[in-house]
Amino acid sequence: MNKIYTAIIFTLISTFSLAQSSFKQNHDFGLALSYAPKEVNLSLSWKQMYGVTANQKFKLGYGLRFNGYLSNDKDYITAPAYLTSGEKGPQVLFVENIEENIDTFSVHNSQHNSINAVIYIEYDFSEKWGVGFNIDAAGIAFGGSREGTMVSSNRPANTSAQVSAKPTPYNVLLISDNDIGMLNSELYATYNFNKKLSVNAGFTFLFTEYTTEQKIAYNDNNDRFRYKSLMGMLSVNYKPFKK
């Protein structure tokens, strides 16, 4: 009986040690730069990827990401889905915007930061080449207060108002305009120089969002305004413990 207990304990210790070793080797740190005219985003990330097929080519993973975004002269529009499309839920993907419900918050200099949990999907065609997609799931956002100009579709074209706003403080991935806050996603191709070093090139699709200090009465008491960015992206990833 003692031999059985000893064997069980040894097996558990060995399994735990292997799991710890695999976790350490899978640490993947990334630095990404995304750019489009009058806007830029810098991302710092950490992730863990795990093969889910027999050949280990298809991988799922999780991680954390910091985003720092700067822009000039951007128009943030009414964010909530119930206003932009008159719908809630996944059907917002297939419904056109209701233009008369959409107001504009124009900001000369925008600055947003976020820390989010991230979901990763990747596929390796070979040891050198692969493709991937990732998306922020939930987290927090922060940044300084900004003054902007509010222009309403329900007001005369020559009428505007100055409004103060801050980045929406929390981020939640839902679906399309149901999303809340600052959320980043990337679609990319990967080239692996070796087991430790790789580069990604592709596109960043980024939501940033301001919450006004006061609700806008003529916009159905809405206080959330969103800007959607599409930028080119280049990143470097490094696995320091990979053998």
Q: Which role does the model predict for each range below?
A:
Residues N41-S45, N72-A81, G143-S152, P156-T159, ...:
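Outer-membrane beta-barrel translocator domains and adjoining extracellular loop/strand segments
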Residues G30-S34, K47, I102-V107, Y170-I175, ...:
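Extracellular loop and loop/strand-boundary signature of outer-membrane beta-barrel proteins
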Residues Q20-T84, K239-K243:
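Short glycine/proline- and aromatic-enriched beta-strand/turn motifs that initiate or cap beta-hairpins
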